[in-house]
């Protein structure tokens, strides 16, 4: 049985990834600091499962990481741990530098020392996979797509911190020989998404009868990737990716933000109509745009398709329908999040 050390597993993408990995027979050791967006309820179904080991801790704690590596002898380390919300990075960039840059460096140092001490056969097979974002590339005009050779041009404190972490991962490969892989993904959506991000925020506010905030003119474009597709892409890169390479992961589903909000409203009108009969779109409220808001992201994932045979299985229409249905049937999970410190308020609106 393979063993993976996964960081950030109580978050959105990491949580979905761990659920799928354990179901596929992987032994997973989880390290998570349980910051505001981490939710143990995401993995409640794994409680008591001997193939799932949870450790509360920070990737920046090199001694702890070293102990876990020595104790559990993983065949791979997958780094999902990150502060990831752009609005929060505008309000307080320090936490993003600490986790995404300083924390990644500490993790890399511990993993490098562990990897160097492995027997030859295990050392050759070992991989460190770093999960990153397309936001490191900056913004696009009306045409074109990000490729793996697009120059980095991050525009927010969040994307700058992730760019720095990407560069550290690359440097540890070229300097020390650490067998790394990096994935840069487009906007994810799906179950267990913390409701500060657009799609779960709109669902939660719509059901609460509150205004649905749309930044600026709502015509910012994002490529939307269903989280299950992303998890499959990561497994594919881990299994077959070329060491030292970066792979872009996209959903082939470019949509304006306003189109995403309208699609959610239509699904809620169908499955959970308002008592007064009014359409959910009547709740849309255009608000002041985010400072430095990137206009368009688009991913060219042809390298991943051509080299490794991966492409998304879900269309946006399929994925968003499944996502809305999940939130409607899992309101206990949502309420558990809202019973914490977050109350669907806007963050980072001014500089």
UniProtKB/Swiss-Prot annotation:
GO molecular function, one term: dTDP-glucose 4,6-dehydratase activity
One example of a Gene Ontology biological process annotation: O antigen biosynthetic process
Record-listed NAD(+) binding positions: 12-13, 32-35, 58-59, 80-84, 99, 158-162, 188
EC number: 4.2.1.46
Cofactor: NAD(+)
Statement: the UniProt record of this protein carries the keyword Lyase: yes
Name of a matching Pfam family: GDP_Man_Dehyd
UniProtKB keywords: Lipopolysaccharide biosynthesis, Lyase, NAD
Transmembrane segments: none
Catalytic activity: dTDP-alpha-D-glucose = dTDP-4-dehydro-6-deoxy-alpha-D-glucose + H2O
Enzyme class: lyase
Sequence similarity: Belongs to the NAD(P)-dependent epimerase/dehydratase family. dTDP-glucose dehydratase subfamily.
Protein name (database record): dTDP-glucose 4,6-dehydratase
